[in-house]
Amino acid sequence: MTISDVPTQTLPAEGEVRLVDIGSLRLESGAVIDNVCIALQRWGELSPTRDNVVMVLHALTGDSHVTGPAGPGHSTPGWWDGMVGPGAPIDTNRWCAVATNVLGGCRGSTGPSSLARDGKPWGSRFPLISVRDQVEADMAALAALGITQVAAVVGGSMGGARALEWIVGHPDRVRSALLLAVGARATADQIGTQTTQIAAIKADPNWRNGDYHETGCRPEAGLKVARRFAHLTYRGEIELDSRFANDGQGGEDPADGGRYAIQSYLEHQGDKLLARFDAGSYVILTEALSRHDVGRGRDGIHAALRGCPVPVVVGGITSDRLYPLRLQQELADLLPGCAGLEVVDSIRGHDGFLVESEAVGELIHKTLRLAEDRSSRPW
């Protein structure tokens, strides 16, 4: 696969999902995935010079549907409604916002539930991927649309890891970046929680080593447990205790075998994910997150970050227990293009980057001002 500036496919209509064919993709591991498609949406018009693209990068279970109502092909509303649109922080009167469903996902892009060349689901044959592979796939999808440089990359959590790989691996292709609620590498705590989630899925008898897609049975119980555990790491401890304390759910009494309110809440989160996500994708993407390390093959984190010239805004959440502030502080300290850590005060934990709209919107404004400042300079 080579990056060309000659478009071979066209941008979708605003809000429409387009499956962009990028051909074969050689992974960081050396494995090759054939016939790769990346699901892509856009909002706003592409400028004649193709220099106003803002890539919006989703987190683990997100997709390309950043904004807009639920509807055909979108079982849920946009995951960042209010951040993209006319007059929004990513103002589509000025910018062309583009989002993909990540490689390995299950919302249109090639992943374990997709059909391989033999017409059967990839399942357990789907190779291990990395965050860098996801970035290469995104870049190839943009290149197929005639876009080889972007004004900004914006992402939180796994999206933040992708944004970091964009600016370190391809600094000549991006003018600015917003890194939210992420770190330079996966920590032992993150790897521990993530491998435990994977273990829950693989312990489900319906997992069948990942080859369950044609059996009519999915590892539903395992995926729901994984999501319940993950969701605890996404929210703040104070928030959860203030909402649920040790209360029973409705009229149920935990002392008599009834459920706790927090238990019911987490069960609901598991049910919601089950309705829209594939367990195989959950495993593949979570494994990629556990291997995230921007310093791998680049003489370590310090050298990788110090060598990145891209202007960047780094933001963290005060109550984030999955990606604590010390991880964003490291990024802010080592990236030459960062003026200092931006702290969002929130009790909502890691998910603060999704729900603290006013504060995060201001960080987006700062990021796009950096892109504007560089727009008149040679790349």
Curated annotation (Swiss-Prot):
Organism from which the protein derives: Mycobacterium ulcerans (strain Agy99)
Keyword Repressor on entry: no
Biological process according to GO: homoserine metabolic process; methionine biosynthetic process
All residue ranges annotated as the AB hydrolase-1 domain in the record: 52-356
Keyword Acyltransferase: yes
Name of the protein in question: Homoserine O-acetyltransferase
Catalytic machinery residues: 157, 320, 350
Top-level taxon: Bacteria
Localization, UniProt: Cytoplasm
Chain's role: Transfers an acetyl group from acetyl-CoA to L-homoserine, forming acetyl-L-homoserine.
Gene it is expressed from: metXA
Keywords, sorted A to Z: Acyltransferase, Amino-acid biosynthesis, Cytoplasm, Methionine biosynthesis, Transferase
Major localization listed first in the record, in broad terms: cytoplasm
